[in-house]
């Protein structure tokens, strides 16, 4: 506006400076208005801001530092599985206490210390001793149930026929329903033949014995012909609306029935375990046989409860339409 060498007023330079000043103000006002308009109701992406970049870089540095801190320990554990298992066992509180499952569920999919809980609230596996049900109920009182004890109970059932009346009453109810399809015989003959076929698969009796020994006294068992393999399969129907199988009970069930699949399922409102032969597995053939005729004679001398037989007839009517899982 003024020349440095003199105080002579230069109108041309003054007009140019005014134009520059006005253009700067207009540009600033436009940018401010544009920034205000662009932020009305619209989320501004600030991922490219310097502060965001610094925060992301800082976070990555912290993660890398933590990874480097434990990398030697984790690499050592990965190369020494036995030490890794020992470290996991020393954990007081498990990392995961429950895992949701869907039905049908094969019990062979469980791992060590997995309990099974079924109820209207859901189906899940729990870590033994840490699952909510185990925390409340505690450890079950299980008697000896190794292979020798199961075989002894199977052989001596003739002398303890009243104790296993729930198992034998199902045979009478199934014979009354006409289980022996295509066989024209009296109800007594059908019952004896069905009993012989069921006793030819000792694992079915073993599963029933283990469940009763595990505290499930009122479990009901149903016998149906297995069309996929020769023989019969058994449905163990639970009387309650919720079921909890302790991991020790599951281990005993699986150990008692080699060559069989045990699958948890639900039908209408009843939870059931389906015990059936596995086509690709061999069963134990070194089990003494028992006389079905002698046991049936004892059954004829025993007066079965009419309510128990009626309950079985109703259960057979309910499960006639049930399709067992493969």
Swiss-Prot record:
Major site of localization recorded for this protein: host cell
Zinc finger feature spans (CCCH-type): 115-244
GO molecular function, one term: zinc ion binding
Post-translational modification: Phosphorylated at serine residues in the N-terminus. This phosphorylation regulates the localization within the inner nuclear membrane.
Keywords: Host membrane, Host nucleus, Membrane, Metal-binding, Phosphoprotein, Zinc, Zinc-finger
Subcellular localization, as worded in the UniProt entry: Host nucleus inner membrane
Pfam family, one: Herpes_UL31
BP terms from Gene Ontology: viral budding from nuclear membrane
This protein's GO CC annotations: host cell nuclear inner membrane; membrane
Subunit field text: Forms a heterohexameric complex with NEC2. Interacts with capsid vertex specific component 2/CVC2; this interaction directs the capsid to the host inner nuclear membrane to initiate budding.
Stated role: Plays an essential role in virion nuclear egress, the first step of virion release from infected cell. Within the host nucleus, NEC1 interacts with the newly formed capsid through the vertexes and directs it to the inner nuclear membrane by associating with NEC2. Induces the budding of the capsid at the inner nuclear membrane as well as its envelopment into the perinuclear space.
Family to which the UniProt record says this protein belongs: Belongs to the herpesviridae NEC1 protein family.
Name of this protein: Nuclear egress protein 1
Gene: NEC1
């Amino acid at each position: 506006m003024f020349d440095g060498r003199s105080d002579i007023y230069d109108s041309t330079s003054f007009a140019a400076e005014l134009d520059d000043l006005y253009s700067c103000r207009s540009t600033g006002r436009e940018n401010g208005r544009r920034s205000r308009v662009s932020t009305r109701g619209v989320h501004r992406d600030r991922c490219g801001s310097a502060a965001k970049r610094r925060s992301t870089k800082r976070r990555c540095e912290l993660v890398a530092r933590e990874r480097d801190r434990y990398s030697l320990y984790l690499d050592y554990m990965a190369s020494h599985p036995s030490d890794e298992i020992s470290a996991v066992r020393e954990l007081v509180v498990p990392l995961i206490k429950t895992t949701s499952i869907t039905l049908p569920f094969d019990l062979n999919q469980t791992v060590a210390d997995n309990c099974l809980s079924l109820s209207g609230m859901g189906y899940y596996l729990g870590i033994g001793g840490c699952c909510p049900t185990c925390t409340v109920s505690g450890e079950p009182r299980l008697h000896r149930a190794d292979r020798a004890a199961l075989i002894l109970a199977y052989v001596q059932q003739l002398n303890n026929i009243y104790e296993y009346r729930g198992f034998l009453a199902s045979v009478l109810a199934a014979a009354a329903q006409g289980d022996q399809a295509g066989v024209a015989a009296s109800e007594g003959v059908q019952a004896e033949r069905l009993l012989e076929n069921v006793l030819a698969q000792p694992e079915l009796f073993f599963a029933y014995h283990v469940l009763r020994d595990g505290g499930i006294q009122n479990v009901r068992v149903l016998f149906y012909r297995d069309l996929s393999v020769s023989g019969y399969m058994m449905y163990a129907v639970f009387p309650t609306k919720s079921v909890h199988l302790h991991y020790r009970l599951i281990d005993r069930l699986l150990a008692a029935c080699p060559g069989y699949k045990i699958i948890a399922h639900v039908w209408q409102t009843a939870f059931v375990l389906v015990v059936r032969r596995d086509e690709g597995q061999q069963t134990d053939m070194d089990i003494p046989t028992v006389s079905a005729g002698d046991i049936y004679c004892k059954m004829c001398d025993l007066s079965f409860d009419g309510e128990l037989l009626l309950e079985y007839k109703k259960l057979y009517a309910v499960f006639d339409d049930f399709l067992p899982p493969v």
